[in-house]
């Protein structure tokens, strides 16, 4: 994922920053606890395509407790 693209792309629901998850090829919104898939290098930023995530996946500091 292009770092410059990550600087300008935002969650279409809350307009918050997205974090790139290279292992699962998705962009994560920590605020809404959802992920947007990346297909063939293109982020699919449609709310109906978003995948719900558990809180522990979106808050890495909780995993270390």
Curated annotation (Swiss-Prot):
Q: Which SUPFAM superfamilies match?
A: Trm112p-like (SSF158997)
Matching InterPro entries, A to Z?
Trm112-like
Q: Which GO terms describe its cellular component?
A: cytosol
Similarity comment: family membership:
Belongs to the UPF0434 family.
Protein name (Swiss-Prot/TrEMBL):
UPF0434 protein HSM_0997
Task: Look up and give the organism this protein is from.
Answer: Histophilus somni (strain 2336)
């Amino acid at each position: 994922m292009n770092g410059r693209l990550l600087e300008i792309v935002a969650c279409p629901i809350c307009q918050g920053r997205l974090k790139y998850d290279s292992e699962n090829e998705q962009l994560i919104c920590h605020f809404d606890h959802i992920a947007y898939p990346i297909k063939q290098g293109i982020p699919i930023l449609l709310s109906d395509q978003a995948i719900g995530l558990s809180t522990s996946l979106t808050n890495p500091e909780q995993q270390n407790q």
